[in-house]
Amino acid sequence: MSKKIAVLITDEFEDSEFTSPADEFRKAGHEVITIEKQAGKTVKGKKGEASVTIDKSIDEVTPAEFDALLLPGGHSPDYLRGDNRFVTFTRDFVNSGKPVFAICHGPQLLISADVIRGRKLTAVKPIIIDVKNAGAEFYDQEVVVDKDQLVTSRTPDDLPAFNREALRLLGA
């Protein structure tokens, strides 16, 4: 069954951490909807390898419209967490119990949303202390799945495992 996957993304996202999962989700028949401050805007990856035209504005969506949430890394999550609309969307999504996929710096939005206390996850090395300070149990491994809801990975090298577990939770 086709699922709708929300992606919170803005400029300087880690190119492959969006393109790889998005391609795999689409191949499995799922719909990927990109969300930023402004619909129709084009955002660029930090390596300049990918650009994405935003489908929806954060003001026109709610977590109830989606089946899963993807939080790619790079600088994008840090930029987005400065806007409470994205933090609230993330918090409400996690609290809904639906799958959330966060890689590299993606957990920065989870930290700002205060939803990882007592959860198991991994992330890129520079934010390990932030993950621990937010009350999560950190695991240095390619993919961590917590409560069959939260899938996290560290870097683009972990994308095969990240994509595999995300697709498993989507039922694909």
UniProtKB/Swiss-Prot annotation:
InterPro entries: C56_PfpI-like, Class_I_gatase-like, DJ-1/PfpI
Organism: Escherichia coli (strain K12)
NCBIfam families (alphabetical): PfpI
Function as written in the Swiss-Prot or TrEMBL entry: Protein and nucleotide deglycase that catalyzes the deglycation of the Maillard adducts formed between amino groups of proteins or nucleotides and reactive carbonyl groups of glyoxals. Thus, functions as a protein deglycase that repairs methylglyoxal- and glyoxal-glycated proteins, and releases repaired proteins and lactate or glycolate, respectively. Deglycates cysteine, arginine and lysine residues in proteins, and thus reactivates these proteins by reversing glycation by glyoxals.
Name this polypeptide is given: Protein/nucleic acid deglycase 2
Gene from which the chain derives: yhbO
Regulation acting on activity, per entry: Glyoxalase activity is inhibited by zinc ions at pH 7.0.
Record localization: Cytoplasm
Span of domain PfpI endopeptidase: 3-171
Signal peptide from the UniProt entry: none
